[in-house]
Amino acid sequence: KTLPTLGTVTIASDNTYDHLATSGDVITLTIVSSENINTPTVSMLGATTGVTVTQGADASNWTATKTVTGGHSDGTTAFNITFADIAGNNGSAVTSLTGGDDAVTVDKTIPTITTASIASNNSSGDELAVPGNIITLTIVANEDIVEPTVSIATQSATVYIFSDAQYCSSVYSMTFNESNVTI
């Protein structure tokens, strides 16, 4: 009597950033067992409801998918896999990933800007800008953000995201085609 094991359990989201998920994203667990198993029972995000389990090429390869909805809480995607081999031997329930893969974090919270400041390098005052001056907009968000689209004086600005992705800076150099402005 040999108990089955799960040699591979990985997780990913169909989000652009596969370690993140928001409402509407599909989270997929990939499961590879040591031998053929019956259809495993998989709970994700606190329930088996809404989880679709599909056999792959054979009964040792499985995927389990679930779509994130507004009712799911933010946080790391918890899961539980129970399974048995074809002979009925139960394997130990699995609740963690193999191989150090990234977990999927559900994040449905809209980021907000907590601080924003704008200044120029004008020698008469950082609130003024004339052609040739550089205007810098610094933004601090409440969580990591992707590169925002920023316009300064109605023109596209160059954006720099810092290593702590909650902080970014946007820079624009006033051209001679623009009037003096107060920023």
Description of each model-found segment:
Residues 25-29, 133-137:
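Structural beta-strand segments of beta-rich domains
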Residues 14-18, 23-25, 39-80, 84-87, ...:
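Extracellular beta-sheet repeat scaffolds used for adhesion and glycan interaction
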Residues 9-13, 118-120:
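Short, flexible domain-boundary/linker segments around small modular repeats
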Residues 1-9, 96-114:
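Flexible, low-complexity linkers/stalks enriched in Thr/Pro that connect modular domains
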